[in-house]
Amino acid sequence: MLAEQFTDKNKHAEQELSPGSSAVTGARNWRASLTLNLTKESNRTILKQAAHQGPLRVQRPFYPEGAQRPHIYILHPPGGLVCGDEIEIDAKLEHGAEALLTTPSAGKIYRTDAAGHRQCQTVRLNCADAQSLEWLPQENIIYDGAEGAQTLLLETSAASRFIAWEITALGRPAADAPFASGAFTQTTRILRDSAPCFFERVALRGEGPGFQEPWGLQGQQVYGSLLAGYVQDSPQKRLQQCREALQANTAIAALGDSKDLRWTLTRKDDLIILRALCQQSEPIKRLFMAAWSLLRPALIGVESHPPRIWAT
């Protein structure tokens, strides 16, 4: 069942927010939002609400793992953010619902205009009452000259089970287009029973010290973080098992040798944190998928099932 709430007001707002001159900024921009509400009925997770404004929406849910756990693809037809664009995604899972959310392609934040209008993306995910939530988007590419800001907020409870990752590529080295100017800020917050549990903020300027210093990106162009919680059964043992399995993975080891992939696996109490640096996105994606395959059975109780869209 898919109930979409498209009111006359939303349709009017969509027309108002199509590309054109903004009364607020004077810039050409999109302002788009997507609100999802999922619940469980008769052992089936359904998309109860999918309300959108602007060029942001979802396809119908796919159920490759059965009725309990849909895969939901979030679509942004323009493909990227230009000057003044703002995107907000809100998803709430209720009453034991389960879901995997992903995107079909890389997100992009393009060069801004001469006035430096910011491009902003905010994702708020509430899984406090959910059985499980997975947020596994494709990478975000930050173009030279962008003025981007991204925020991820996870609202959880002590009983929550979730895996979330973000991968960010600064510039396009393969096209000889490094991130030489502009700025990018990325904030990740986790609330646990409404109290702060995890906070991380990355603030970079083109060719600033954060790119080369040991405390920063160490000369790499791509970075990512994977967060998995909450591990109730021997979190330190689970962490060590995951670390040893990744170290023994010959495919991951080869990426470190040939692609300069660097990673570290730590934990904050029962929250497991995997961080990675590289010159390319693909090695980090492979690392995260390997970690996801290891952590998913322990946290969610099922084997990994990659979304079909990843293979296209």
Swiss-Prot record:
<keyword id="KW-0963">Cytoplasm</keyword>
<comment type="subunit">
    <text>UreD, UreF and UreG form a complex that acts as a GTP-hydrolysis-dependent molecular chaperone, activating the urease apoprotein by helping to assemble the nickel containing metallocenter of UreC. The UreE protein probably delivers the nickel.</text>
</comment>
<dbReference type="InterPro" id="IPR002669">
    <property type="entry name" value="UreD"/>
</dbReference>
<dbReference type="GO" id="GO:0005737">
    <property type="term" value="C:cytoplasm"/>
</dbReference>
<feature type="compositionally biased region" description="Basic and acidic residues">
    <location>
        <begin position="1"/>
        <end position="15"/>
    </location>
</feature>
<comment type="function">
    <text>Required for maturation of urease via the functional incorporation of the urease nickel metallocenter.</text>
</comment>
<dbReference type="Pfam" id="PF01774">
    <property type="entry name" value="UreD"/>
</dbReference>
<feature type="region of interest" description="Disordered">
    <location>
        <begin position="1"/>
        <end position="24"/>
    </location>
</feature>
<dbReference type="GO" id="GO:0016151">
    <property type="term" value="F:nickel cation binding"/>
</dbReference>
<comment type="similarity">
    <text>Belongs to the UreD family.</text>
</comment>
<keyword id="KW-0143">Chaperone</keyword>
<protein>
    <recommendedName>
        <fullName>Urease accessory protein UreD</fullName>
    </recommendedName>
</protein>
<keyword id="KW-0996">Nickel insertion</keyword>
